[in-house]
Amino acid sequence: MIPNFKIKRLIQERSLRKATVEREVAKSYGLAQKVTSPIIRIPYTYNYTVEGDDKEKELTKTGFINFSPKSTAINGQVNTETRERSIFDILVYNSMLDIEQTFDLSQVNLSKYDKYDLHYDEAYMIYGVSDPNGISSEMSFAVNGQTLDSEGLVTNNSGKRSYIKSSPFTLDLSKKINVKTKSSFKGTSSVAFEPIGESFSTNISSPWPHPSFTGSKLPNRYDISEAGFESQWSLNKFANAIPKVWENNHVNIHQSAFGVNFIQPLDEYGKNTRTAKYALLIIVLCFAMYFIFEILQKKPMHPIQYILVGSAITVFFLLLISLSEHIGYNMAYLISSVATIGLISLYSSFILSSLMSTLVLSSLLSSLFGYIYLILQMQDFALLAGSLALFVMIAAVMMLSRNVNWYALKTGPQSIQT
């Protein structure tokens, strides 16, 4: 069991190494992205006086008022690709989003802000992307047909979230405002959306066939195939607690999010971990085969011989781990199993001193490693298949040794009766 523990420890270390490489790639390419849909913001100034030691002092307070949209519709395409770093393949993506929004501010109550001087001619859009380093092209905003450029980044009070800021435009509250936003950004592992507005819908498609939908809401509809996936979310005002208007950063607009993780169903290290869990089963079944030959041929084997066979099986897992990093799990399993079966069969030919017995043992070992491979491909029935294999082997040992005089084993191999 100690070698098995060491094997699992090695797999964990290699897996952590890959995770470190993934983080390095994400820092330079783009982290997991979280998108905050655009909102309108207008700055304000407020002049007031305070009592000083000798005289009144005039101060000016600055801030901004935020307006959430009535409706938001996001259509996005997320294209995935694999980047090679060292011996690892890292999954990354490039996302292109088209966002259409409607703002109806004619009924918004601004009476609580009457004391402020609102600068409607300096209104601007803000659009949140959690990792601005991943932005791959210039953002574009169109407000009622007027094209606005992006002017840089603004942050919230904590400085932890950044938003792309558009060039200013004049806001007319009496008119309905239609906004179109185009963006393209890169990222890794996942993309999520933070809904704002009374009505919010998102349509995302990608060629990646292994999505995992996460967050505060699952898709209303999705379609997954080998060609990729399409998903659709829709929320109404009852599922979205963001108000129509608020001051500064007094409202947490990041309270809920939903999206998709781009998962690799089972990478080489995951497959190796599953394989290592069957190490004890492989060793037990292999020893059982040797024990059957020991009984049938009336030729006791030394414990050292069992240890050497067990060591060969342990090396099988080391070969599997190291080869799978370079040529993939399936080919690594084939090469490692053939090498291990060949080594054990060659060694056994000298122990058994019988070509027929060696061929039978080689066939049984091939069947064992082939059966274990089939178990590893299963998801729901792996435990059942493994249990059945162990049961059949125990039953075979019991039946083949049913006539053995176990007490006679003490007097030497010549006394064994079958």
Q: What spans do the regions from the language model cover?
A:
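Generic detector of multi-pass transmembrane helix bundles and their immediately adjacent loops
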Residues: 280-418
